[in-house]
């Protein structure tokens, strides 16, 4: 049987015109060379994986920058009118005082307030509410038997929010039991 194998292998090499690979080789390439090529392939795959991971992290970071930039632009657009609205609050306060005595001034006050509301301005409700230091500024405490401690009993100046952000606190008097 061993003779048949050696004859076939000799015949195969004679028919192909090629010699059989030498011992310690793979298809005519030395084993050392194959091991070296495999190592290089593994190194290249590892580097490719590292680069892919790096690329994915960069892409995620870019997406985050784009989202943050978009949010900042939206917020800037929302609050671009804040400076002018703050300046108009003084006029709105004066018009509100005049509206208490004059119907024409009341109509103007209502129109201006509607315009400013359409831009996101909202008055802060104060009287009768629990004192909140985020929206109220206590100007004084008033002894009161009717109101509970910490309840706003008087408003000296109206406060406002712009798109739910306080742009001016309400100036108030807060009840305390005496």
UniProtKB/Swiss-Prot annotation:
Residues 1-32 are annotated as: Disordered. GO terms for cellular component: cytoplasm. PANTHER family: GRPE PROTEIN (PTHR21237), GRPE PROTEIN HOMOLOG, MITOCHONDRIAL (PTHR21237:SF23). The keyword Cytoplasm applies. Residues 1-11 have a biased composition (Basic and acidic residues). Homodimer. It is found in: Cytoplasm. Its main location: cytoplasm. Keywords: Chaperone, Cytoplasm, Stress response. Belongs to the GrpE family. InterPro entries: GrpE, GrpE_coiled_coil, GrpE_head. PROSITE patterns: GRPE. Pfam families: GrpE. This is Protein GrpE. Participates actively in the response to hyperosmotic and heat shock by preventing the aggregation of stress-denatured proteins, in association with DnaK and GrpE. It is the nucleotide exchange factor for DnaK and may function as a thermosensor. Unfolded proteins bind initially to DnaJ; upon interaction with the DnaJ-bound protein, DnaK hydrolyzes its bound ATP, resulting in the formation of a stable complex. GrpE releases ADP from DnaK; ATP binding to DnaK triggers the release of the substrate protein, thus completing the reaction cycle. GO terms for molecular function: adenyl-nucleotide exchange factor activity; protein homodimerization activity; protein-folding chaperone binding; unfolded protein binding. It comes from the Archaea. One of its GO terms (biological process) is protein folding.
